[in-house]
Amino acid sequence: MPPRRSHKKSRAGCRRCKNRKIKCDEVHPRCGNCAKHGVPCDFSNPDVLEELAISTNTSTESVGAPTPSPAPTVNFNSAPRTPLTRPRAPSSPARAPRPNPSPPTSVYSQPSISSSTNTIDHGERMLELRLMHHYTNVTSKTLLTNSPAAEDIWQRAVPQMAFSGNGKTYLADAILSVAALHLRSMSPNDKALVRASHAYSASSLSAFGASLGAGITPENAEALFLTATLIAFQASASRIFVKDDGDAAPGDPTVRYVPPLSWFHAFQGVKTVVANSWQWIHHSDIVKVIIDSQPSFQLNLNPRSPDSFFGHMLEGLADELSNEDPRLVASTTQAYSHAVSVLNWAHKNYHAAAALTFTATVSKRYVDLVDARRPRALAILACFFALLKRMDNVWWLQDVARREVMGLVSLFEPGSKWWRHLEWPIRIAVLDGSSIPQDIWGTELEEQAPEQQNVLGSMTQHIEMFAEMLNQHTQPPIPIADEDLIVPDSPD
């Protein structure tokens, strides 16, 4: 009998496969075993994002009060109502906290040391140098920055901040993870890049979550904002590696299309981090350039106005809500109306990247409606993905419009009344390339939305309003003692 071939054991599998002691194919964002059994996979909703999506506590500890409150967490699904600080001692939590996964070693944390040669592992070092080189020279220029100044920030200032260290390994690992994803998109069969993208993502998420749990401070606010942005980018870019089920027949019971809720969780997480750290980062030259590069958020609050391209998405809403829980009627109406308003704004905007604002600005109620597979919410989501067609030449958005729109369409029954509302996104999705004729797009693009009385202002004003609503009832951060600092588990 020939000897068994040796193999290198991977620790990058999902938690469910590890618990079941079966081999994980490590396909992101949902491994083959989880997809086969129709169960959630922590690749599609990583631990830290899942934990950070838990609603924060509604009460805070009064200064000097004898009874401390539980440590709040960032809510990646909805706005938290407590500051991102950590009390000195937590009270009894509702559930036991999960230990942080052991992050992979890197030259930015604790490098791999050979017991015989006492040197850094050459292969790991060369891979990290390759990833950082690719990020600074290529990937940083694909982040849809809208301005040369913002591009320079991501290309030069962000890596410099990562190099400065100060214990902020999560920013360096987030950079390496994004670079690995980019290289992996060009070499999908390179297993080293697959493992690297998984490992650096897990490491970044673990350290990022620990830092958020300890609290946002003037010292870490910039790095946390930049890392949250790169995590959101990872959540979006990882979607290109999902098995394509967009060509399934409508109503096909075997279809496994799942709407990418991770996009919403991650981008709304960026908004939450920004709002909770705004008192510090709005003075940052780095953050100011990034925020100012975003299109002016002039939102018409009347989605049923005569020039509303997507106003038809609200037809029949009153009749639909007659069977809704009375406690949810107002929030559901507002969720749909606001989502349509954002679509109208992005549809006319000269800057194609304006469409990505949708994932960060829609309400938690709308995300819940998508999760519940409400037809109206899914039709609106199909229009959002159709808007991304203008960026089909960007590597992490390539073919996303077609795949996601057709995937969403597959969730509708053949005789659904919603088919006429899906005609426009389907027409856009099946086009070749990112150049779309104006008669098909449906409107003329505007450099800036026209001034109107009933609009929201600049992106900075929008953030300041959100931050004020978030923090008007909060207290000053509680100082953190050395013994309160979270230390990640040591590697096996």
Curated annotation (Swiss-Prot):
Family matches, as SUPFAM superfamilies: Zn2/Cys6 DNA-binding domain
Keyword Phosphoprotein recorded: yes
Outcome when changing T82D: Mimics phosphorylation by HOG1
GO cellular component terms, semicolon-separated: nucleus
Region (Disordered): 58-119
Impact when changing S102A: Impairs phosphorylation by HOG1, blocks induction of CYP51A expression and exhibits hypersensitivity to tebuconazole
Outcome of mutating T82A: Impairs phosphorylation by HOG1, blocks induction of CYP51A expression and exhibits hypersensitivity to tebuconazole
One of the record's GO molecular function terms: DNA-binding transcription factor activity, RNA polymerase II-specific
Keyword vocabulary terms for this entry: Nucleus, Phosphoprotein, Transcription, Transcription regulation
Source superkingdom: Eukaryota
Biased composition (Low complexity): 78-95
Residue spans binding DNA: 14-41
Keyword Chloroplast applies: no
Subcellular location: Nucleus
Modified residues (Phosphothreonine): T82, T217
Job description of the protein: Transcription factor that targets gene promoters containing 2 conserved CGAA repeat sequences. Positively regulates the expression of ergosterol biosynthesis genes including CYP51A and CYP51B encoding the sterol 14-alpha demethylase, and ERG6A and ERG6B encoding the sterol 24-C-methyltransferase.
PANTHER family tied to this protein: STEROL REGULATORY ELEMENT-BINDING PROTEIN ECM22 (PTHR47657), ZN(2)-C6 FUNGAL-TYPE DOMAIN-CONTAINING PROTEIN (PTHR47657:SF14)
Protein name: Zn(2)-C6 fungal-type transcription factor
Organism: Gibberella zeae (strain ATCC MYA-4620 / CBS 123657 / FGSC 9075 / NRRL 31084 / PH-1) (Wheat head blight fungus)
